[in-house]
Amino acid sequence: MHWASTDKCLPLLPTNPNYSIYTLRHHMLELVIRAALEAGRAIMDIYTHPDTDWEVERKADNSPLTLADRRSHAVIAQALEQTPYPLLSEEGAHQPYDERKDWEALWIVDPLDGTKEFLKRNDEFTVNIALVQHGTPTLGVIYVPAKHVLFWGTQADGAFRAEVDPETLERSEVKQIPLTAEEIGECPYRVVASRSHLSEETQTLIEDLRTSHPDLDLVSAGSSLKLCLVAEGKADIYPRDRKSVV
């Protein structure tokens, strides 16, 4: 398959059949990282613009949908068209189960995770992109555009965190995670929970945890930022029941 970019802002995927699996994986990861960063930039253009129209639509499940959701989706969808895998996106076209049940690999995307946090303007929203192969996540990127922090990882190479320059989108201060105990330091038993979707079941679980961890510190956060806090060692557990929303 010939993979090539139609956007000069996005890296080309290699077409040379002699490239190693490692090189192909690296180019794929770089394309996805760049897509997440460009999507984050599109979101921030709307988030910071003084004349932004904050009109909100409602999807079938009554969750909010904004212009930023759509812009981010468009950026990511264009980038992922270069790859041989189909896209299942929170804001994309509905894919019937009979069609996608036979997909061996696919991209799963939430172009703006934490739309409620975006509307509250508390900076706790993310761009999420994952490649799932045979039911297993093998590559993932989470970008927190308002905080200029990027997380990424692959099944083969592990997970990493970096700071991002919002102007150039260049990465710096790259660290592999999980971090060492020395880097994390001493802290109380920390539980991270949803800021907008904290259910009674989750609250009960947290109180149960408090009996064995009297020093429990509850931290509320939005979107997939909660998972990033656990990955960084800034939280010990993210409890959620089946009815809750990430």
Where are each of the predicted segments found?
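Conserved small/polar residues in nucleotide/adenosyl-binding loops
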Residues: 245-246
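Alpha-to-beta junction loops
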Residues: 232-237
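Compositionally biased, intrinsically disordered low-complexity segments enriched in Pro/Arg/Gln/His
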Residues: 13-14
